């Protein structure tokens, strides 16, 4: 039996899967950081460029400061950033020198482990990103094979990609990334040996979501196949569309004869903290999912499906949902089987909706579909169906989008901002709206303390003080007394 290590995804992927990436702010993360550091995880999946953008937009917090503070609060556990290569916050392909600066600043602020994936499986782009990361000081690069189900994504397809990764001197590990939770234990038993046969002694990891209930079983199968690193989430940030529960998976791994060297007490404390936080903030807890065979066909993530249903409801076309879902399968095949992770589910679903609603298929084509076809998101894994490609490229709008200038080089971008601006602030301003970064800067340093147990009381006091007839508020408990009085008599 194997010695298994764990990567915790609660703060980044678990948060994003269940709480829409906005559920945790800097103070809430810092409060649990020392406990997470004690658990003994191999790494913490901490952030992504998308996550950094969300911090600026929604909580008006400096994502660079968040990384630095977390690094100081949890010095013993590597922090991971997941990247899709030559993109930072924006989905536009960035200049290589720009990305080099991004990686340099991430390392300087405290990121040491980088998970590099390319949803199109463009290995040249992925491996070039790995090279830049290493040259800028990244300690560990984990190259991802993004799993999906289609006519072209067979075991040999992944094995060939893995062989290319294994030849690189800039990759320390390889992981099978199953963002939609499609990988069954049965498929794992053929896929993992096929990949392992082509990578020599390169360590493997498995990252499998629980979207249709498969993740925990797939992780157990992977451990039996001698995969030594599994990705998990904690407490309410596990299950649902997130990843397997760390607590339950550890119990099951040990029951199967594997060893997992973690601090169980610290893990229990972390689970309790996130549970209290979820209760205080009104955030949902992930629950085990039932198996849904239809999901294997359309692969539309839950959040995207909810949006699609709402759009049809607003149009009073709720009965069209089955037709749109069926069209999603057809469009995905015609576009070369893009893996259904952001932004591709949105792109495929938008086209499917237009095809069902319009006078004929592809009579309307959104800009993002055109950008996909002309390679703005990278080279499609499989060729776009020729008749569809010809029809899209013949549109005047396609010619306009093809004429769009590429992202400016770093030196040109730098000239647009003051010379004394820090690299960290420059990188945000180069890719985000000015008003959003201005608001973040104006907000000042992030709050660093948080207690979920006092949040309901604070909210109650805040609401009571708004009442015009409240003259005095009192709070008493053991060794504590608080009195708040109005400064003038109530009207």
Task: Place the predicted regions along the sequence by residue.
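Glycine-enriched alpha-helix->loop->beta-strand junction motifs that scaffold or abut catalytic
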Residues: 40, 110-112, 137-139, 167-172, ...
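Active-site beta->alpha loop and helix N-cap motifs at the rims of alpha/beta catalytic domains
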Residues: 34, 43, 47-163, 171-174, ...
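Catalytic alpha/beta core domains of metabolic enzymes, predominantly
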Residues: 179-363
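Conserved, mostly hydrophobic/aromatic
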Residues: 6, 14, 36, 116, ...
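N-terminal small/glycine-rich loop or linker at the start of catalytic domains
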Residues: 1-22, 74-91, 138-149, 194-203
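Catalytic cores of alpha/beta
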Residues: 98, 153-165, 212-227
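Conserved N-terminal beta1-alpha1 strand-loop-helix module at the mouth
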Residues: 3-46, 54-55
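Terminal or standalone catalytic/regulatory effector modules within metabolic enzymes
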Residues: 37-38, 43-55, 288-295, 299, ...
């Amino acid at each position: 039996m194997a010695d298994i290590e764990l990567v915790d995804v609660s703060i980044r992927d678990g948060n994003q899967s269940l709480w829409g990436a906005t559920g945790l702010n800097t103070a809430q993360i810092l409060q649990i950081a020392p406990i997470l550091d004690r658990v003994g995880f191999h790494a913490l999946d901490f952030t992504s460029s998308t996550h950094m953008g969300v911090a600026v937009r929604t909580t008006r917090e400096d994502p660079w400061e968040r990384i630095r503070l977390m690094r100081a609060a949890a010095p013993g556990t590597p922090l991971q950033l997941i990247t899709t290569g030559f993109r930072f916050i924006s989905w536009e392909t960035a200049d290589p020198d720009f990305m080099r600066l991004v990686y340099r600043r991430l390392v300087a602020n405290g990121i040491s482990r980088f998970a590099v994936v390319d949803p199109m499986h463009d290995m040249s782009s992925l491996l070039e990103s790995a090279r830049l990361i290493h040259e800028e000081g990244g300690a560990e690069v984990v190259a991802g094979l993004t799993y999906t189900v289609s006519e072209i994504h067979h075991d040999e397809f992944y094995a060939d990609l893995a062989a290319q990764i294994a030849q690189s001197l800039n990759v320390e590990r390889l992981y099978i990334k199953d963002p939609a939770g499609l990988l069954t234990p049965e498929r794992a038993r053929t896929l993992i040996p096929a990949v392992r046969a082509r990578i020599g002694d390169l360590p493997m990891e498995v990252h499998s979501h629980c979207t249709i209930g498969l993740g925990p079983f797939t992780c157990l199968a992977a451990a039996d196949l001698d995969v030594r690193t599994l990705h998990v989430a904690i407490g309410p940030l596990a299950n649902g569309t997130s990843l397997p529960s760390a607590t339950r998976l550890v119990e099951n791994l040990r029951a199967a004869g594997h060893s997992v060297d973690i601090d169980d007490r610290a893990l229990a404390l972390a689970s309790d903290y996130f549970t209290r936080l979820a209760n205080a903030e009104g955030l949902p807890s992930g629950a085990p999912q039932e198996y849904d065979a239809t999901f294997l066909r359309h692969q539309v993530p839950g959040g995207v499906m909810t949006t699609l249903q709402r759009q049809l409801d607003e149009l009073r076309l709720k009965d069209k949902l089955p037709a749109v879902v069926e069209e999603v399968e057809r469009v995905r095949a015609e576009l070369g089987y893009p893996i259904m992770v952001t932004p591709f589910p949105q792109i495929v679903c938008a086209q499917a909706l237009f095809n069902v609603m319009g006078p004929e298929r592809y009579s309307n084509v959104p800009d993002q579909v055109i950008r996909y076809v002309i390679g703005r998101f990278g080279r499609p894994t499989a060729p776009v169906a020729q008749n569809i490609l010809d029809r899209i490229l013949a549109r005047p709008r396609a010619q306009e989008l093809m004429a769009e200038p590429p992202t400016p080089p770093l030196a040109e971008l730098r000239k647009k901002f003051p010379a004394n601006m820090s690299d960290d602030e420059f990188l945000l301003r180069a890719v985000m709206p000015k008003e959003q970064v201005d608001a973040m800067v104006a907000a000042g340093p992030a709050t660093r303390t948080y207690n979920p147990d006092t949040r309901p009381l604070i909210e109650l006091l805040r609401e009571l003080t708004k009442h015009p007839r409240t003259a005095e508020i009192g709070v008493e408990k053991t060794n504590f007394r608080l009195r708040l009085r109005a400064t003038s008599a109530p009207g």
